[in-house]
């Protein structure tokens, strides 16, 4: 929205400076996008006097002029047809900024003759569109006077208007807001009905079906005859030119002026070209309209038009028609003022791709109560500027219902806006904005004005109070510090996080692989059942839900080995699918190690990964999950995809909770992966739940000051007895003194009886309160021997 300072002051009685108005506009939500003050660029121009104007010696259309600048005589080459001796002109001397080009004037030669200045047109100063010749000034002006001293320049202000503030698409609406803000007083708008001198020969009708009556609920007009459609007065031209509009003729300029001055689009028809009455109706499919913009439009049903007996003459609220447009020869006009439905107007404009000043206002909802008053004001201006006489007004329809009553509770201003405003101040603000305010049991009863259709509820009134009271008056309040949020992770999610961190700590790299795989691989790992096939796989070789996480990890190791990464460790936490029904999926922590566990080194030989690496990984994951690894049994059995002699199962009672070991060499060959590869699978949901909360602090570490001591035991056992059974039996012999048990030797040979083996363990004793005597040590040793014998049948070797 553009307007000039003088234009604003025609509605606002104020002594505020341009800077104060700029600040005030932004403060009330009408953001200033720019201010164009012509005087900033016109300080170098002076009044010049042409003393001589002779023909250029080398150009027929150029003149060689002697111009008095007040400080000396300059030679100026000029091509303007009206350049002549005795003329007072606007003179630019070298070093002057030229607004139209943005250049600084320099001396130069034109067809071999030096030109020491430039005589300017209004267009070159961006003060108008006239560029047919140089500007002609009053001959009484003093030569050498600054242009700033002889002319007044009106700054142009451009603001950004939000879609809900259609009232501020008129200068009066902006002035009203500034007056409410305290930057002056709103001047009264006097609407005096124009008495009709005769009855209009053109009537108005509304021809809508009942369901379409909202398209145009009110249509008013009047016939004005004997008009003279000449040029507009200079003040009107200046205002339109300042905001970028081109003055056309008095009648057209008046309608454009009302659109920007009072946010009331109007239209004038050449009455001599209108046949019969003017009616508002819906268009018929296939009708056409030649618009004032030079384009022809094919109309559709549902579009509102203004028509006569011959057909459409205008698109309602959007564009006038060329046929009934006014020209210099027009002597009789019909003035139209109406209210058109915003939704239909917007839909028609979008459909036909027309964006006009009228559409821009009507589709946002202009003042429905200002139809007839605007017609009276426009009639008076036409009579004043164009002469003639007006008929009696003709009106069809009624004013649409716009009245609303809203209760404003004063405390809501503080609750929603965060600022304390007195009830009296609220009432003053709302009254200044045009609202009718009365007392109410709950606070204030407010009736918004007709031009504020955007005020529909209490919160809108709160916004108006806060806006006019000043956003700067809202105290700065820091945001409340949020409390420490409570943990939202489930126990299972926390357990997964602990395991994930532990495996990463052990050097394994986390991966995320597909939850499906080729059927052939699924079969190798105990899956591939028909019910596990995908109905719509993303790829033909990813057609089965995975029965294990290991296949994807093993094949990933193979791809890495092909690219030179032969030694690596991978892990993944994700589901494996045992069946298609809910509850037939298990959360698994799986991992693999491939290649060498330890690289080449001068002190230690390289070593390939083996089942014990996988066992260490799975036991560390068990501990990280909050379970006690010592409570699990290791059984020398595993699924078929593990090496039959280098694998094992972790059991809790009779329930498997995980597998570990080297991957079967035959399976690796089928997958084209070079071994060895060791892996593990831990079923997290099968582990016992923690007895203590994860956030519970660990007990204080009490390190014993007494020296530990080791005792070795060798047992003769049946070859089928697992070493783990011996270790568990020895550890449980005395849980207070025994801190660790480890296997350090295994012998099966000629010196042992058939079906027998020798297993040696070392037991670490850690006293806590006193040094152990020989008797204490012997007693613990006896307990260990007895416990192993009872659990495994083993005998202590001599």
UniProtKB/Swiss-Prot annotation:
Mg(2+) binds at residues 454, 460, 463-464. Residues 401-476 form the B5 domain. InterPro entries: aa-tRNA-synth_II/BPL/LPL, B3/B4_tRNA-bd, DNA-bd_dom_put_sf, Fdx_antiC-bd, Fdx_antiC-bd_sf, NA-bd_OB-fold, Phe-tRNA-ligase_IIc_bsu, Phe-tRNA-ligase_IIc_bsu_bact. It comes from the Bacteria. It catalyses: tRNA(Phe) + L-phenylalanine + ATP = L-phenylalanyl-tRNA(Phe) + AMP + diphosphate + H(+). Keywords: Aminoacyl-tRNA synthetase, ATP-binding, Cytoplasm, Ligase, Magnesium, Metal-binding, Nucleotide-binding, Protein biosynthesis, RNA-binding, tRNA-binding. CDD domains: PheRS_beta_core, tRNA_bind_bactPheRS. It is found in: Cytoplasm. It holds the Pfam family tRNA_synthFbeta. Belongs to the phenylalanyl-tRNA synthetase beta subunit family. Type 1 subfamily. This is Phenylalanine--tRNA ligase beta subunit.
């Amino acid at each position: 929205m553009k307007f000039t300072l003088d234009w604003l002051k025609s509605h606002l009685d104020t002594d505020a400076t341009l800077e104060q108005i700029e600040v005030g506009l932004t403060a009330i939500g009408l953001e200033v996008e720019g201010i164009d003050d012509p005087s900033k660029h016109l300080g170098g121009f002076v009044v010049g006097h042409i003393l001589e104007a002779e023909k250029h010696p080398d150009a027929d259309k150029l003149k060689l002029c002697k111009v008095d600048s007040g400080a000396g005589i300059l030679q100026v080459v000029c091509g303007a047809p009206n350049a002549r001796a005795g003329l007072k002109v606007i003179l630019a001397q070298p070093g002057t900024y030229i607004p139209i080009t943005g250049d600084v004037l320099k001396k130069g030669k034109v067809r071999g003759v030096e030109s020491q200045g430039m005589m300017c047109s209004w267009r070159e100063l961006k003060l108008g569109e006239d560029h047919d010749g140089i500007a002609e000034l009053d001959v009484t002006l003093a030569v050498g006077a600054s242009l700033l001293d002889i002319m007044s320049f009106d700054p142009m202000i451009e603001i950004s208007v939000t879609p809900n503030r259609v009232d501020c698409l008129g200068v009066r609406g902006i002035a009203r807001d500034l007056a409410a803000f305290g930057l002056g007083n709103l001047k009264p708008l006097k609407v005096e009905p124009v008495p009709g001198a005769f009855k209009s020969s053109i009537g108005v009708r509304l021809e809508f079906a009942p369901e379409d009556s909202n398209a145009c609920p009110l249509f008013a007009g009047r016939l004005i005859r004997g008009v003279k459609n000449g040029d507009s007065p200079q003040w009107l031209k200046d205002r339109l030119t300042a905001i970028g509009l081109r003055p056309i003729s008095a009648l057209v300029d008046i309608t454009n002026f009302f659109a920007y001055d009072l946010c009331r689009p109007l239209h004038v028809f050449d009455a001599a070209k209108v046949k019969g009455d003017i009616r508002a109706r819906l268009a018929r499919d296939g009708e056409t309209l030649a618009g004032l913009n030079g384009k022809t439009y094919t109309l559709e049903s549902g579009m509102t038009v203004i028509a006569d007996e011959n057909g459409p003459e205008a698109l309602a609220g959007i564009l006038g028609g060329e046929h009934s447009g006014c020209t210099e020869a027009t002597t009789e006009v019909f003035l139209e003022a109406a209210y058109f439905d915003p939704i239909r107007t917007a839909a028609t404009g979008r459909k036909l791709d027309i964006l006009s000043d009228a559409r821009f206002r009507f589709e946002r909802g202009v003042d429905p109560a200002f139809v007839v008053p605007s017609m009276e004001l426009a009639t008076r201006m036409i009579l004043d500027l164009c002469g003639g006489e007006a008929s009696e007004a003709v009106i069809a329809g009624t004013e649409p219902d716009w009245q609303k009553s809203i209760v404003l509770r004063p405390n809501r201003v503080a609750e929603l806006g965060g600022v304390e405003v007195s009830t009296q101040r609220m009432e003053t603000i709302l009254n200044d904005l045009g609202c009718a305010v009365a007392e109410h049991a709950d606070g204030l009863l407010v009736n918004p004005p007709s031009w504020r259709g955007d005020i529909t509820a209490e919160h809108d009134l709160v916004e108006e109070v806060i806006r006019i009271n000043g956003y700067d008056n809202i105290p700065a309040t820091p945001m409340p510090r949020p409390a420490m949020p409570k943990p939202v992770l489930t126990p299972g999610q926390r357990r997964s996080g602990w395991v994930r961190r532990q495996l990463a700590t052990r050097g394994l790299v986390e991966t995320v692989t597909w939850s499906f795989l080729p059927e052939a691989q699924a079969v190798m790992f105990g899956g591939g059942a028909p019910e596990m096939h995908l109905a719509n796989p993303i790829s033909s070789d990813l057609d089965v839900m995975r029965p294990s996480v290991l296949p994807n990890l093993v094949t990933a190791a193979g791809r890495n080995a092909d690219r030179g990464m032969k030694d690596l460790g991978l892990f993944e936490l994700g589901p494996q699918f045992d069946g298609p029904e809910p509850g037939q999926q298990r959360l698994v922590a799986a991992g693999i190690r491939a290649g060498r566990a330890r690289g080449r080194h001068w002190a230690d030989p390289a070593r390939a990964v083996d089942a014990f690496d996988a066992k260490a990984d799975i036991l560390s994951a068990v501990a990280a999950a909050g379970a006690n690894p010592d409570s699990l049994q290791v059984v020398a059995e595993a699924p078929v995809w593990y090496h039959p002699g280098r694998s094992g199962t972790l059991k809790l009672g009779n329930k498997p909770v995980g597998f570990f070991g080297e991957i079967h060499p035959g399976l690796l060959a089928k997958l084209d992966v070079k071994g060895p590869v060791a892996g593990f699978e831990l079923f997290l949901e099968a582990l016992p739940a923690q007895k203590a909360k994860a956030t519970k602090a660990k007990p204080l570490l009490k390190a014993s000051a007494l020296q530990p001591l080791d005792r070795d035991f060798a047992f003769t056992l049946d070859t089928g007895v697992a070493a783990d059974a011996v270790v568990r039996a020895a550890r449980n012999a005395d849980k207070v003194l025994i801190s660790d048990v480890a296997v350090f030797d295994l012998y099966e040979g000629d010196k042992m009886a058939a079906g027998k083996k020798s297993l040696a363990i070392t037991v670490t004793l850690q006293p806590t309160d006193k040094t152990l005597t020989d008797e204490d040590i012997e007693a613990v040793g006896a307990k260990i021997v007895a416990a192993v014998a009872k659990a495994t049948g083993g005998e202590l070797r001599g």
